[in-house]
Amino acid sequence: MTLYQIKPLFQSLLRPTMFWLYKHHVTANHITLAALALSLLTGLLLMLAAQPILFLLLPIVLFIRMALNALDGMLARECNQQTRLGAILNETGDVISDIALYLPFLFLPESNASLVILMLFCTILTEFCGLLAQTINGVRSYAGPFGKSDRALIFGLWGLAVAIYPQWMQWNNLLWSIASILLLWTAINRCRSVLLMSAEI
């Protein structure tokens, strides 16, 4: 069970916004680039300032990014805006945004740089394995337990927690370690889904 499974409900809430954007000639690629720009600017601010209180921004930005990601996909599918450029922007934008938003954790007190870098590597690996499924079987794998939406929830809550209770940063490295394990588990599950689907075919 992952947050990805409640995506249809989230999309239904966003559908009026999607129609408004379409009416005003906003394209899926515009939304994708806006999400990327927001992530890069937020990540840069968090890294340069390196103040725990600013991590209050993280859950807000992650929620906005999640909404923008849903909107760009809806515009592409439902408004006939699917393009090869859009697919490239979507996949690369997701990975770059993840790095931009989670790399600032490295600059928090009590954070072990190697653990944060390992976590980011596992994040990229997880997305690569999801894409690998699409390359082999034609269907992208969103297997959990620690997909993009789940990461946004957990890291957003942690950003909120350390902003309000800075003393909780003593647990940073435990969270990065657990996250890395869950990400590796997710990568394995996504590879397994490729093999299982291939066996069925």
Swiss-Prot record:
Keywords: Cell inner membrane, Cell membrane, Membrane, Transmembrane, Transmembrane helix. Gene3D superfamilies: 1.20.120.1760. One of its GO terms (biological process) is phospholipid biosynthetic process. It is found in: Cell inner membrane. Pfam families: CDP-OH_P_transf. The chain crosses the membrane at residues 44-64, 85-107, 117-139, 152-172, 176-196. It is a multi-pass membrane protein. GO terms for molecular function: phosphotransferase activity, for other substituted phosphate groups. Residues 65-84, 140-151, 197-201 are cytoplasmic. The keyword Cell membrane applies. One of its GO terms (cellular component) is plasma membrane. It comes from the Bacteria. Residues 1-43, 108-116, 173-175 are periplasmic. This is Inner membrane protein YnbA.
